[in-house]
Amino acid sequence: MVLADPEDNAFCVLEERSEYADTGPIAALPLASADPGRNGEFWAWLTGWDDVPGSTTRSLRHPSGRGPFLELCPEAEPKTVKNRLHLDVRLETGEDPDEVSAAIAAHGGRELHPGWGELPWRSYADPSGNEFCALPAR
């Protein structure tokens, strides 16, 4: 069943599925993808998350086996507008933001320059154009 929150963001209430048995109240974060295989490789590299074996959709999950899946879903049509929601990733202590930026580009992503002035994080898009932010290490 597809519902919407007060800001009209769609979300699904799914039937019980064995693959989501231990994910908690949020089973999965779907991400539209022009190429789920390519984006799966990108997000696995960026997050360090592992492939979910036996999943019907290219899915990744934290190596601890806890929390929701990141599901790379085939997009219905090419992306034309900014996503209503986006993911944030945090750099590890000692990672150089410029080196991470170069590596993101080498893996098919690109840095965005939204013109918001000086901020502590940097904005990017994955190979399918999904926006995300890279936050500084704590």
Named regions from a protein language model:
Residues 4-55, 60-113, 123-138:
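Glyoxalase I/VOC metalloenzyme domain signal
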Residues 117-119:
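Short, small/polar residue-rich loop motifs at catalytic or cofactor-binding pockets
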